[in-house]
């Protein structure tokens, strides 16, 4: 087994070799919790959830840490607007974030540190940087990192200091020695949360927070650091500078994290998602209209490094495809019940290999689609199934569930999943499910009375509204086209 990942630091695909055999330490930058999470968060955290699932399925003991930033300028601004305590506001939105992640089927990290609970570690790390000459306190209560002291600054983002200096500036009130320098500690201001430090009361800057929490919960160096590609600069670039300067004499980026991975942006109908364009969607906006697993399935259809394009139409198509997968699993499990499954189907190992190759989820979904087509053909073949055919269907169902477990899909009983997906689709079309059930009962009575004209009229009337009836051994079910 060889797992290949695209490493942002080297801009190459590399074999993922943990520092300690059999164990992997992963840090993913979590959300700044000042509002409900948006589609960009959904895309990001589904990606890293699949990474964790696959690494564990491949036998690695993964320690997964993802933080909450609950001390930040945006949180303070939002809290002041609402007259709310900043930490309380952040806690409320952190709870909402958990609800959204649960709806998407994401596993919880092993550790979820919060900035507000790590102030002593942050202060100690800043003091270490001052002691080693990489940071300075100008005397106004702030502390800054001296960017030019770190020789590999910009290596991750492929930017040199000459390029950066053109866009750098000193804000009014800042006491930077160099426009490139960034804040590690900010002096207290009225109405803001503040903590004691050797430089006076204040609060941490954004970048130092993740460095401190990574070191506290994973040590240094770690194996893998991940997040959205918008974090490459300045956040991850600054994390490297801080963490390496505090812990290593070699001053190489690898002394903090051996591998860096980043996921692409979310676009809405081929435009960048933004509030100013009026195309900004929270996860809750989407989950009010679509099933959470359908959204997850949709997100997996684009390779994690590529930008992801969202549209209702394509999500609805993904929802239809997911329903078809569940229908096939239902048939395979029903027809293969009571027999010993046959050998593991070849598609399972092909799916593993695709995930080993930089977590190629679109390729996995293509492999799964081929396998499901074959299973459908076998399940729908007329006549009684032989013991061998039943064993093949049972093996397919077990393999489908195994691949689904790594992707975080196909984990529900088919009837439950199909009903949930159908009900969301019906609601979007203005279809009343209780009315459909009433008409199904009326149609059953008409058929029992041999009133086939009435039976056909009900079926055709529902079909005209996008409702397809399916008659089976257990009765009539329905779905929305």
Swiss-Prot record:
A motif ('KMSKS' region) lies at residues 272-276. It comes from the Bacteria. ATP binds at residue 275. A motif ('HIGH' region) lies at residues 31-41. Its main location: cytoplasm. GO terms for molecular function: ATP binding; cysteine-tRNA ligase activity; zinc ion binding. One of its GO terms (biological process) is cysteinyl-tRNA aminoacylation. HAMAP family: Cys_tRNA_synth. This is Cysteine--tRNA ligase. It comes from Anaeromyxobacter dehalogenans (strain 2CP-C). The gene is cysS.
């Amino acid at each position: 087994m060889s797992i290949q990942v695209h490493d942002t630091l080297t801009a190459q695909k590399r074999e993922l070799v943990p520092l300690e055999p059999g164990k992997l330490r992963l840090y993913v930058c979590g959300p700044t919790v000042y509002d409900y999470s948006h589609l960009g968060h959904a895309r990001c955290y589904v990606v890293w959830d699949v990474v964790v699932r696959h690494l564990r399925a491949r036998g690695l003991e993964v320690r997964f840490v993802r933080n909450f930033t609950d001390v930040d300028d945006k949180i303070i601004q939002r809290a002041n607007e609402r007259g709310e305590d900043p930490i309380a506001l952040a806690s409320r939105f952190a709870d909402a974030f958990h609800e959204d992640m649960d709806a998407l089927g994401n596993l919880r990290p092993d550790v979820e540190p919060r900035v507000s609970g790590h102030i002593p570690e942050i202060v100690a790390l800043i003091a270490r940087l001052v002691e080693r000459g990489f940071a300075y306190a100008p005397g106004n209560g702030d502390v800054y990192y001296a960017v030019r002291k770190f020789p590999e600054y910009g290596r991750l983002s492929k930017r040199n200091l000459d390029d950066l200096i053109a866009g750098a500036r000193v804000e009014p009130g800042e006491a930077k020695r160099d426009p490139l320098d960034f804040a590690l500690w900010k002096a207290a201001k009225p109405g803001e949360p503040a903590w004691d430090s050797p430089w006076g009361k204040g609060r941490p800057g954004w970048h130092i927070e993740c460095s401190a929490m990574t070191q506290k919960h994973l040590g240094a160096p770690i194996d893998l650091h991940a997040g959205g590609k918008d974090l490459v600069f300045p956040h991850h670039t600054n994390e490297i500078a801080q963490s390496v300067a505090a812990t290593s004499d070699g001053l190489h980026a690898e002394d903090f994290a051996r591998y860096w991975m980043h996921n692409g942006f979310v676009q809405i109908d081929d435009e960048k998602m933004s509030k100013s364009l009026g195309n900004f969607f929270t996860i809750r906006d989407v989950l009010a209209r679509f099933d959470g697993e359908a959204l997850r399935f949709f997100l997996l259809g684009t390779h994690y490094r590529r930008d992801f394009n969202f549209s209702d139409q394509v999500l609805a198509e993904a929802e239809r495809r997911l329903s078809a997968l569940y229908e096939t699993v239902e048939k395979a499990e029903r027809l293969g019940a009571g027999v010993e499954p046959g050998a593991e189907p070849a598609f399972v190992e092909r799916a593993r290999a695709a995930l080993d190759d930089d977590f190629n989820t679109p390729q996995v979904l293509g492999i799964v689609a081929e396998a499901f087509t074959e299973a459908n053909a076998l399940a729908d073949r007329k006549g009684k199934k032989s013991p061998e055919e039943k064993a093949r269907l049972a093996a397919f169902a077990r393999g489908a569930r195994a691949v689904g477990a790594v992707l975080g899909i196909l984990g529900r009983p088919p009837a439950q999943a199909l009903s949930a997906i159908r009900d969301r689709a019906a609601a979007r079309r203005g279809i009343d499910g209780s009315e459909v059930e009433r008409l199904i009962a009326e149609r059953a009575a008409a058929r029992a009375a041999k009133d086939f004209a009435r039976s056909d009229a009900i079926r055709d009337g529902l079909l005209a509204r996008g409702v397809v009836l399916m008659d089976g051994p257990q009765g009539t079910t329905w779905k929305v086209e």
